């Protein structure tokens, strides 16, 4: 099982994702902002980051840019209620593995996570 970081300003969504992933046996840490995620990434190792695209202040795009600046190879799954083809293309160009559309289906989250970290 993997160690996963969730970055989402929506507490309900963040808690829901955390609960699903913990039930699958993953160790999960959550952050309510991009800055919180960057701080967590500086102190711990993660096998995967699940990050919301649109958050107040810095966005998921900002997180991807910061990860690349730090030469981090941690895989990122972006989540968004606003994802369209342009958003998907932009985040993939910056290194995200894929975009999961909100509301996230449990089965899809489990399957995408398992592809990256096993489970």
Language model features with spans:
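C-terminal output helix
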Residues: 86, 104-113
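Active-site T/S-Asp motif of two-component receiver
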Residues: 51-52
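Acidic, metal-coordinating helix/loop segments flanking the phosphotransfer/catalytic sites
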Residues: 30-48, 69
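Acidic catalytic/metal-coordinating carboxylates
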Residues: 33, 59-62, 95
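Two-component/phosphorelay signaling modules centered on CheY-like receiver
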Residues: 11-29, 94
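The feature encodes the CheY-like receiver
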Residues: 14, 56, 84
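Short amphipathic alpha-helix used as the core "switch/output" element in two-component signaling
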Residues: 39, 61-73
